[in-house]
Amino acid sequence: MSQVYNFSAGPAMLPAEVLRRAELELCNWHGLGRSVMEISHRSKEFLEVAHQAEQDLRDLLNVPENYKILFCHGGARGHFAALPLNLLGEKTTADYIDGGYWAKSAADEAEKYCSPNIIKIKTEIDGKIAVKPMKEWQLSDNAAYVHYCPNETIDGIAIHEEPDFDDKKIVIADYSSAILSQPLDVSRFGMIYAGAQKNIGPAGLTLVIIREDLLGKARKETPSVFDYTVLAENDSMFNTPPTFAWYLSGMVFKWLKEQGGLQEIAKRNYEKATLLYSAIDNSDFYINRIATENRSLMNVPFQMSSPALDAVFLKEAEEQGLVALKGHRVSGGMRASIYNAMPFAGVQALVDFMADFERRHA
């Protein structure tokens, strides 16, 4: 079978080495005569998987000891609700930074539980979409926390700054599409959460990294499966966790360490994104509407000067093994998601195809 490069925004491409290893182990994991999908989450064997996955993740992100790592159900959308239920405490408002589709979705969900202070940060620079720098965010004094999304998967907008607010501010970030793409100072955040299906592993698992002093504040009506204190006290096994997704995510963590860690991964991601954005910027046929300083390194949306060619582009791209390039229904056009698992060769193949398509259709 010819090479296929999967540019899906999620569920996304997984490292080929991880998939090959999983294939070898699928039916007879560690000589047990069973798949890892069939063993108890409380067995000695799976507890070793869980412990190693957590340790490898701690190593990759240099997670401080006063942070708990939770492997949860629910997807990021589930945690849009779990977050206010766990962290509002006695307060009735939280700051929600609206920088794109997913940040706004989190704020919309929070309205069920509080009165969010929605801070719009989108602006324009020379006709391009940008976001205001953090120093211009008008944060409130009485908010329980500040929530933002550093990488907007649909919009292709990134906030590359790390928070540097007053020490009293509890900063929460939805890192679903940027987690593990570069080094990160976890200590600047009260909590980070991320759906696994983009840069961690298969769909069905959600990662939560939360500072210990934020536990124990959940409202009494919080479902137990979404109570971070309950999950922490039970080592993420209050109910049966998504064991196969946990196992595969652990393999991805190990793969990232084998590649040289997040410094090396960040270098590769920058090189891939630079190649693709350069191809777009040097063309009159392709258009990216995001200001350079706020472009995502993970999700690159682009349109063609003639939208009537979209279907032709997608069909021909798929014939060349370049799949899942259709843009989100909200934004249209094309979108290339180039997460950690996407090799440079995949982006090069896309750029070569784009140049050839332009020659034939411009």
UniProtKB/Swiss-Prot annotation:
Biological process per Gene Ontology, one example term: pyridoxine biosynthetic process
Group of enzyme by EC: transferase
Protein's UniProt keywords contain Transferase: yes
Cofactor(s), by name: pyridoxal 5'-phosphate
SUPFAM superfamilies registered for this protein in UniProt: PLP-dependent transferases (SSF53383)
In-chain residues carrying the UniProt-annotated modification N6-(pyridoxal phosphate)lysine: K198
Keywords: Amino-acid biosynthesis, Aminotransferase, Cytoplasm, Pyridoxal phosphate, Pyridoxine biosynthesis, Serine biosynthesis, Transferase
Subcellular location: Cytoplasm
Chain residues that bind pyridoxal 5'-phosphate: A76, R77, W102, T153, D174, Q197, N239, T240
A molecular-function term among this protein's GO annotations: pyridoxal phosphate binding
GO cellular component entries: cytoplasm
Cofactor note: Binds 1 pyridoxal phosphate per subunit.
Binding site for L-glutamate: R42
InterPro entries recorded: Aminotrans_V_dom (IPR000192), Aminotrans_V_PyrdxlP_BS (IPR020578), Pser_aminoTfrase (IPR022278), PyrdxlP-dep_Trfase (IPR015424), PyrdxlP-dep_Trfase_major (IPR015421), PyrdxlP-dep_Trfase_small (IPR015422)
Catalytic activity of the protein: O-phospho-L-serine + 2-oxoglutarate = 3-phosphooxypyruvate + L-glutamate; 4-(phosphooxy)-L-threonine + 2-oxoglutarate = (R)-3-hydroxy-2-oxo-4-phosphooxybutanoate + L-glutamate
Pathway: Amino-acid biosynthesis; L-serine biosynthesis; L-serine from 3-phospho-D-glycerate: step 2/3; Cofactor biosynthesis; pyridoxine 5'-phosphate biosynthesis; pyridoxine 5'-phosphate from D-erythrose 4-phosphate: step 3/5
EC number: 2.6.1.52
Complex formation: Homodimer.
Family per record: Belongs to the class-V pyridoxal-phosphate-dependent aminotransferase family. SerC subfamily.
Name of the featured protein: Phosphoserine aminotransferase
Classification of source organism: Bacteria, Pseudomonadati, Pseudomonadota, Gammaproteobacteria, Enterobacterales
